[in-house]
Swiss-Prot record:
GO BP annotations listed: anther wall tapetum development; pollen development; trichome morphogenesis
Gene source species: Oryza sativa subsp. japonica (Rice)
Function according to Swiss-Prot or TrEMBL: Essential for tapetum development in anthers and microsporogenesis. May regulate the timing of tapetal programmed cell death (PCD) which is critical for pollen development.
Ranges annotated as spanning the membrane: none
Protein name stated in the entry: Transcription factor MYB80
Subcellular location: Nucleus
GO terms of molecular function: chromatin binding; DNA-binding transcription factor activity; sequence-specific DNA binding
Domain HTH myb-type: start-end pairs: 9-65, 66-116
Gene for this chain: MYB80
């Protein structure tokens, strides 16, 4: 439920008050006073609302009110009080005898506000416009504004460097997932992915690889068992020769080695190498003794070729040379020296076959590329 209206709006007069209405209201209040504003309009014979009668009495008909223009002293008081309390018009009017809050508000909005603006003073803050502009400039432009451009440029450079060096997910190799024993390796690969870089190209390394391949091909062709089997399979009806491989298309250096190769000397050198006395072992003493005064070193049983078993001729000569060396009671020193010299000469001939540019070992292309 709302407040009960003070009068019926249908029979209420609106608009400006006439002098007759002012006289009726003034004579009634002077005689009966201001007791009940709801009954005053009816008792005074006015077709006005009770609120309208109250405002007309308070703001215009009271005997202690001042009518007319505000003095300079009153205006200065209003300006000072407004700078302190703001738009609290009732408080300001209480400091001005004979002036109502409505009169003070109307005078401020119609005259004093425009007057202050014309003087270069803000009517809200009561400060000069130049002072306000200085405060705004100080607030919006801190002392660090000179370094803002440099700082922004540095941030831009850092961001661009980050974007250029950032790897996309498509650049990362996707690790393959295997079952069984490879599950742990796959998990570790997923946890710590690696980014292998392509190895640089070195022409010198390519030349070294080619030399290694050439040495391997020469070593395979110089192996008696492999070369004999290949020759027998390739040409079973070919005439027997002293060399274990057939002369085919070969380089000039390989043809020279093919012409100087002697299988008998090769077998003799291998037999001497298997039963020769090592110099270092002879100086240190023999660990394996025979029937005679001479022994065999534990390092002397080394073959000139890794994995080579010699020829049939070397196998036949092997027991005979062993019996001769064991049966003799000391032997002829010259004969022994001659045998050693011949063995060393044959070994040196065969060692020349594998010069520094001939390497016996090679790796597949995949491992070779990775190693380079």
């Amino acid at each position: 439920m709302g407040r009960v209206p003070c009068c019926e709006k249908d029979n209420v007069k609106r608009g400006q008050w006439t002098p007759e209405e002012d006289n009726k209201l003034l004579s009634y209040i002077t005689q009966y006073g201001t007791r009940n504003w709801r009954l005053i309009p009816k008792n005074a014979g006015l077709q006005r609302c009770g609120k309208s009668c109250r405002l007309r009495w308070t703001n215009y008909l009271r005997p202690d009110l001042k009518h007319g223009e505000f003095t300079d002293a009153e205006e200065q008081t209003i300006i000072k009080l407004h700078s302190v309390v703001g738009n609290r018009w009732s408080v300001i009017a209480a400091q001005l005898p004979g002036r109502t809050d409505n009169d003070v508000k109307n005078h401020w909005n119609t005259k004093l506000k425009k007057k202050l603006s014309g003087m270069g003073i803000d009517p809200v803050t009561h400060k000069s416009f130049s002072h306000l502009m200085a405060e705004i400039a100080t607030t919006l432009a801190p002392p660090q504004v000179a370094h803002l451009a440099e700082a922004a440029l540095g941030c831009f450079k850092d961001e661009m460097l980050h974007l250029l060096t950032k790897k996309r997910p498509s650049d990362f190799p996707s690790p393959a997932v295997h079952d069984g024993a490879g599950a742990g390796a796959s998990a570790s690969a997923l946890a710590a992915p690696c980014f292998p870089a392509a190895p640089p190209h070195h022409p010198q390394a390519d030349d070294t690889i080619e030399r290694i391949k050439l040495g391997l091909s020469r070593a395979i062709m110089s192996d008696p068992s492999t070369a004999s089997a290949a020759a027998a399979a390739a040409a079973p009806s070919a005439p027997a020769e002293d060399k274990p491989w057939p002369p085919g298309d070969m380089s000039e250096g390989l043809a020279g080695m093919y012409a100087t190769y002697n299988p008998a000397a090769h077998a003799h050198a291998q037999a001497q190498a298997e039963f020769r006395y090592d110099g270092a072992s002879a100086a240190q003493g023999y660990v394996l003794g025979g029937d005679g005064d001479q022994g065999t070193s534990m390092w002397s049983h080394q073959s000139l070729y890794s994995g080579s078993s010699g020829t049939e001729e070397a196998r036949r000569e092997l027991p005979e040379k062993g019996n001769d060396s064991v049966g003799s009671s000391g032997g002829d020193d010259d004969a022994a020296d001659d045998g050693k010299d011949s063995g060393k000469g044959a070994a040196s001939d065969m060692s020349g076959l594998f010069a520094s540019d001939c390497v016996l070992w090679d790796l597949p292309d995949e491992l070779t590329n990775h190693m380079v």
